[in-house]
A protein has these predicted regions:
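Conserved glycine-rich Rossmann-like NAD(P)H-binding loop of the short-chain dehydrogenase/reductase
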Residues: 18-36
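Rossmann-fold cofactor-recognition segment
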Residues: 41-57
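Conserved Rossmann-fold cofactor-binding substructure of NAD(P)-dependent oxidoreductases
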Residues: 54-70
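C-terminal helical subdomain
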Residues: 176, 183-186, 195-234
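Catalytic loop of short-chain dehydrogenase/reductase
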Residues: 82-109, 117-118, 124-176
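Conserved glycine-rich cofactor-binding loop
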Residues: 6-7
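N-terminal Rossmann-fold NAD(P) dinucleotide-binding loop
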Residues: 10-11
Length: 234
């Protein structure tokens, strides 16, 4: 299951999972023409699901809508996110300290930090039903406290740092059940959020993410890695 599947990294994750023959629940807030095209190409492999991780009622409805359609989720990838309340992509004006508002901070946290935890809470029983449940929370190096040496990105960076600490806590809580939880940064990717100057294509990033997911073992619980599996600073 992948959240934020209407475009960018999420859509490419759904595409590559379906292409290798696996079933994927492609969850997104509003869907897209590209996602509908993917569903049409693989109607037996791609399940489109309306889900807004920033809205508890939407998450509850999404879980109810999936009832009876899948028995278990082997890998849950919390990919949905926003750069800021005002824009899904990087915006230099949104990085300045004097432009940050309480409303922006709260809304960014609601989607980027609280959202993944809400999704996990309501879909965890399906992950538990898998003999090899894995949860990947898509984070960012911008959320690394020890690597933060510049100003800016206040709402986005703080929300990803919050996601990181919740990932660590959840990893410790679920490890006794054999469920592996990690935080992963996809790299700087050419998407609507990353922009055209980014170093990686969605295809490259997603190949790496799926490779990392396939190789996870219980000893990896609580790690923060990049799309190549390299440890990242907290």
């Amino acid at each position: 299951m992948v959240t934020g599947s209407s475009g960018g990294i999420g859509l490419e994750l759904a595409r590559q999972v379906a292409a290798r023959g696996d079933r994927v629940v492609a969850a997104s807030r509003q869907g897209s023409a590209a996602l509908r095209k993917l569903v049409a190409a693989h109607p037996d492999r791609v399940i489109e699901l309306a889900l807004d991780p920033g809205n508890q009622e939407s998450v509850i409805a999404a879980r109810a809508g999936l009832e009876g359609r899948v028995d278990a989720i082997d890998i849950l990838i919390n990919n949905a996110g926003v750069y800021s309340r005002w824009s899904r992509h990087w915006d230099p004006d949104a990085t300045l300290f004097d432009t940050v508002t309480q409303e922006e901070l709260v809304d960014t946290f609601r989607i980027n930090a609280a959202g993944p935890m809400l999704v996990i809470e309501h879909f965890l029983n399906l992950v538990r039903a898998s003999p090899r449940g894995r949860i990947l929370n898509v984070s960012s190096r911008v959320g690394s406290v020890s690597a933060k040496t510049s100003g800016g990105d206040y709402a986005y960076a703080a929300s990803k740092a919050a996601l990181n600490i919740m990932t660590r806590a959840l990893a410790a809580e679920l490890a006794p059940e054999g469920i592996v939880v990690i935080a992963i940064t996809p790299g700087w990717v050419r998407t609507e959020m990353g922009g055209r100057a980014a170093a990686l294509s969605p295809e490259e990033s997603v190949r790496g993410i799926l490779s990392v997911a396939a190789k996870l073992t219980p000893k990896d619980a609580g790690r923060f890695v990049d799309y190549q599996g390299e440890d990242q600073p907290w």
